[in-house]
């Protein structure tokens, strides 16, 4: 972890407009994934403020007020922390800041994605920076009522279903 933190600190200064907050919801202690994502985003020129593990809702809210981020990213690895991520997502809706999220629990239990009002970043960490860049560039909607990101398979099935309806 110390080496990863050193790499993050050595990343070049931000070259892109906007700010991203990244951390873990209350009770989530797993930090390797969020640290890796922080590193990947900083290497791509983003200003990322890493909040760390177990971020209380009141701290998240005050940090949002101060930093005015374009996107908040939260990571949950366990079922009970997916529930705390859901609570955090409701706060983000109230303050109208878009949420992106990911983590092992959403890969293992894909139906959970339907419950989280935000953008699922996908099952592979290395693909997340491109998804995040698209979300920031398009000004993602902070009032999403359910998980919206589709996998390639979902898109193909949806296209096939649409084609069947038209045919």
Predicted regions and their residues:
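Conserved mid-sequence domains
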Residues: 1-98
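Short, ordered loop/turn segments at secondary-structure junctions
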Residues: 53, 77, 104-106, 125-126
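Generic alpha-helical secondary structure signal
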Residues: 58, 83-86, 111, 126, ...
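Short beta-strand elements of ligand-binding domains
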Residues: 98-104
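Glycine-rich, charge-decorated loop segments at or immediately adjacent to ligand/cofactor-binding or catalytic sites
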Residues: 106-118
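Short, charged, surface-exposed secondary-structure boundary motifs
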Residues: 110-111, 129-136
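Short acidic-hydrophobic, aromatic-tinged amphipathic segments that line or gate anion-handling sites
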Residues: 119-128
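Core of compact, soluble alpha-helical bundle domains
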Residues: 133-167
């Amino acid at each position: 972890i110390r080496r990863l933190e050193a790499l993050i600190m050595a990343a070049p200064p931000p070259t892109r407009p906007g700010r991203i907050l990244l951390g873990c919801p209350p009770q989530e202690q797993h930090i390797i994934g969020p640290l890796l994502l922080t590193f990947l985003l900083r290497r791509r020129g983003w200003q990322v403020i890493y909040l760390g593990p177990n971020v209380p809702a009141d701290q998240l809210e005050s940090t949002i007020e101060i930093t005015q981020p374009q996107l908040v990213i939260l990571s949950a690895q366990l079922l009970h922390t997916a529930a705390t991520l859901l609570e955090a997502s409701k706060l983000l809706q109230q303050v109208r800041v878009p949420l992106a999220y990911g983590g092992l629990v959403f890969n293992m239990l894909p139906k959970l994605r339907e419950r989280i009002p935000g953008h699922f970043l996908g099952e592979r960490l290395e693909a997340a920076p491109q998804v995040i860049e698209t979300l920031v560039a398009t000004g993602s909607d902070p009032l999403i009522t359910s998980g919206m990101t589709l996998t390639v398979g979902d898109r193909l099935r949806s296209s096939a279903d649409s084609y069947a309806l038209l045919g």
